[in-house]
Amino acid sequence: MTRILGIDPGSQRTGVGIIDVDATGRVSHVHHQPLVLLGADDFPQRMKLLVLGLADLCREYEPQEVAIERVFMARNPDSALKLGQARGAAISAVVLRDLPVHEYAASEIKLAVVGRGGAEKQQVQHMVGLMLNLKTKLQADAADALAVAITHAHVRATANRLGLSARQAWGRK
């Protein structure tokens, strides 16, 4: 059994989702929550809350691998920069624990979870709920975090069947 932490980075709310995946690739829900960062006075303090929140989750749930959504190009350059900084803070928090990080674009995540790279957010939320047998509707950030974890679980399962690493199976170095 492997535990995967999925991260949907954000500068105000970061979604986190934790799943277990067995040797056959079957996934099960462990935990999900938003890390709400708005309680801090300024942006650097929000990034501190993000790093500390992820460190606490890693201590409590002990994931073995991390999957994170890649930054997309936002219309607002300031928002894109802040999103990139939040992503960097999240990656720093988990690599300090020596966890391997795997990155996936939003279109790759949608393709893996819904079967269509241009799927709507509601479709992702619905499919994640079905895949993990969840009875309550997920918030968007939690669904996205669980979706990136599920994507990595699928890539891992394919890689294992082919005798490759997850990076090799996805065509990455």
Swiss-Prot record:
Molecular function GO labels: crossover junction DNA endonuclease activity; DNA binding; magnesium ion binding
Principal subcellular localisation of the protein: cytoplasm
Subcellular localization, as worded in the UniProt entry: Cytoplasm
Binding locations of Mg(2+) 2: E69
CDD domains: RuvC (cd16962)
E.C. number(s) listed in UniProt: 3.1.21.10
Signal peptide: none
Pfam families for the chain: RuvC (PF02075)
Cross-referenced PANTHER family: CROSSOVER JUNCTION ENDODEOXYRIBONUCLEASE RUVC
Cited HAMAP family: RuvC
Family: Belongs to the RuvC family.
Oligomer and partners: Homodimer which binds Holliday junction (HJ) DNA. The HJ becomes 2-fold symmetrical on binding to RuvC with unstacked arms; it has a different conformation from HJ DNA in complex with RuvA. In the full resolvosome a probable DNA-RuvA(4)-RuvB(12)-RuvC(2) complex forms which resolves the HJ.
Record protein name field: Crossover junction endodeoxyribonuclease RuvC
